[in-house]
């Protein structure tokens, strides 16, 4: 089983948590205050996990000193191929995490099975994955699975534009699977690697103002506590 993993792909942390594998991660590409997963924050606070630089500026000396067995990168590494080459020159294998390309939520979840193979935790992953599929089956077979409720999921970027998910993206799929209806409806399919698109506030408001629920994507832009904070961004 692998140890002293350098985890740069943040989306993989929750999958490692699900298979009780966080102890195998020694090096983080995200600082403590950037983690929303409590187990990761706790590991960094205790010193079990340490910051080793982000994807485009890793601390090579630290990574080597810690005996890193594998670097798990996000697709952002393709913007800095020299980093991947340097890690491999040092004898550190690099894996690019591509779960974000999965359009179905269970497709993303199933990546835990890959990490389980690396850690020798296949049985744990099979059990955890079945728990998730059972939960989804329960929803899909429910008599009232179609709620008719509309849901908007978005954040406002630094230019004031509204970033929304495209139809067919895993977030919009999760909303549909849960019995909701994603709005705006006409955001197009994910016909390329980008699963999001920007639209002007006026257009977004016209299409989403009657949504039953609005979900602000705080993982990108930070949390909002009040409606006034949201209005200030617009």
Place the predicted regions along the sequence by residue:
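A short, gly/pro- and small-residue-rich
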Residues: 21-25, 83-98, 224-234
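Extracytoplasmic substrate-binding proteins
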Residues: 48, 61, 65-72, 78-161
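A short, structured surface patch at a secondary-structure boundary
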Residues: 1-64, 70-76
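Solvent-exposed loop/turn segments at secondary-structure junctions
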Residues: 5, 11-14, 31-34, 58, ...
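Sec-exported extracytoplasmic/periplasmic mature domains
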Residues: 7-10, 17-21, 65-68, 88-92, ...
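Flexible, glycine-rich surface segments
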Residues: 141-228
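Short beta-strand and adjacent tight-turn residues that come in two discontinuous sequence segments
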Residues: 27, 73, 97, 185, ...
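Solvent-exposed, acidic/flexible segments
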Residues: 8-9, 18, 53-57, 76-80, ...
């Amino acid at each position: 089983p692998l140890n002293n993993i350098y985890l740069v792909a943040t989306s993989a942390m929750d999958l490692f948590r699900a298979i009780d594998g966080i102890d195998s991660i020694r090096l983080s590409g995200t600082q403590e205050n950037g983690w929303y997963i409590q187990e990761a924050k706790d590991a960094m606070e205790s010193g079990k996990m340490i910051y080793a630089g982000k994807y485009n500026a890793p601390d090579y000396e630290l990574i080597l000193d810690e005996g890193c067995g594998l670097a798990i990168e996000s697709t952002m590494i393709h913007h800095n191929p020299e980093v991947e080459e340097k890690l491999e020159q040092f004898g550190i294998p690099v894996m690019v995490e591509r779960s974000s390309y999965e359009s179905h939520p269970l497709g993303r979840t199933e990546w835990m099975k890959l990490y389980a193979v690396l850690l020798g935790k296949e049985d744990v992953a099979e059990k955890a994955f079945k728990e998730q599929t059972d939960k989804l089956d329960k929803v899909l077979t429910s008599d009232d699975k179609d709620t008719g409720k509309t849901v908007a999921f978005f954040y406002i970027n630094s230019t004031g534009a509204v970033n929304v998910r495209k139809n067919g993206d895993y977030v919009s799929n999760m909303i549909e699977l849960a019995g909701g209806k994603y709005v705006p409806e006409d955001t197009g399919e994910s016909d390329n690697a980008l699963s999001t698109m920007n639209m002007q506030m006026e257009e977004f408001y016209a299409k989403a103002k009657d949504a039953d629920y609005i979900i602000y994507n705080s993982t990108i832009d930070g949390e909002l506590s009040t409606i006034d904070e949201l209005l200030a961004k617009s």
